[in-house]
Design a protein with these regions (language model features):
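C-terminal substrate-recognition "lid" of short-chain dehydrogenase/reductases
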Residues: 214-243, 248-249
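Residue(s) in the substrate-gating loop at a strand-loop-helix junction
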Residues: 145
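Substrate-binding pocket helix/loop in short-chain dehydrogenase/reductase
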Residues: 101-114, 206
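Conserved glycine-rich cofactor-binding loop
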Residues: 10, 17-18, 41
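Alpha-helical segment proximal to the catalytic Tyr-Lys
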Residues: 130, 174-178, 234
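Active-site helix of classical SDR
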Residues: 125, 161, 169
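Short, small/polar-rich loop/turn modules that mediate ligand/substrate recognition or access, typified
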Residues: 91, 177, 182, 236-238
Length: 250
């Protein structure tokens, strides 16, 4: 029977201490998964774990500043150990969204964006997906952005890093799909998270441009990620699902 139940499975969610990552960790736990909450801020991470446990779920916090291959491999090893040797769901959510015009864009910032948004998922998958393939089952979900599909002033570097992640999603589906590992991505539009609240009314104006007409809550994105993590999405493979209120459709 096809179900969204994740009981008995362990999920690793990066960037899980706030926003979409936090909402995803909570959503996966509510579907029965044991969740490994990965992030930089221990205080916020412990708070997410406490919220999950208070709701009857199981979770643990794994600290880490994800920015390169070494940090990704280190997290993969610690997460696998914490999971008792088996990670069933990987959500690559950690990301950097620094904006700015092309002229004068700092090279260190450029490298940082591509390091966290592209290199980290690449090496996490390289460490975790082979074991999934060996078991014949697993789900990987990458968190992208609508800026990967449309030109947005000031988002050239950020959008390019996520566009590359979309291609990796398809490449990994081709590489690991025959072994039973599903790899998909979600592409959110405007979402009300702490990192964009500084935009104030501008955020609402951007959200109003979509057919949905409003700015999404993190839980609306998390619900789609949780769906992709489950057997309810058993025939969804290599997809980049737009969860943007229809913004890229018009």
């Amino acid at each position: 029977m096809i179900t969204d139940d994740l009981t008995g499975r362990t999920a690793l969610v990066t960037g899980a201490t706030s926003g979409i990552g936090k909402a995803t960790a909570i959503a996966l736990a509510r579907q029965g998964a044991r969740v490994l909450v990965a992030g930089r801020d221990k205080g916020r991470g412990d708070a997410v774990v406490a919220a999950i446990r208070a709701d009857g779920g199981e979770a643990g916090f794994l600290p880490g500043d994800l920015h390169d291959a070494l940090s990704a491999k280190d997290l993969a090893q610690r997460a696998t150990q914490a999971a008792g040797g088996q990670i069933d769901v990987l959500v690559n959510n950690a990301g950097i969204g620094t904006l700015g015009p092309t002229q004068g864009f700092d090279e260190a910032t450029f490298d940082s964006i591509f390091g966290t948004n592209l290199k980290v998922p690449f090496y996490l998958v390289g460490e975790i997906a082979p074991a999934m393939a060996g078991r014949g089952k697993g789900s990987i979900i990458n968190v992208s952005t609508m800026a990967a599909e449309m030109g947005v002033p000031g988002m050239a570097v950020y959008g390019a890093s996520k566009a590359a992640l979309n291609l990796l999603t398809q490449s990994w589906a081709a590489e690991y799909g025959p072994s039973g590992v599903r790899v998909n991505a979600v592409s959110p539009g405007t979402v009300r998270t702490p990192s964009v609240e500084v935009l104030g009314e501008v955020l609402d104006q951007i959200g109003a441009q979509s057919p949905a007409g409003y700015v999404a809550q993190p839980e609306e994105i998390a619900a789609v990620i949780a769906f992709l993590a489950s057997d309810a999405a058993s025939y969804v493979q290599g997809a980049v699902l737009n969860v943007d209120g229809g913004r890229t459709a018009v």
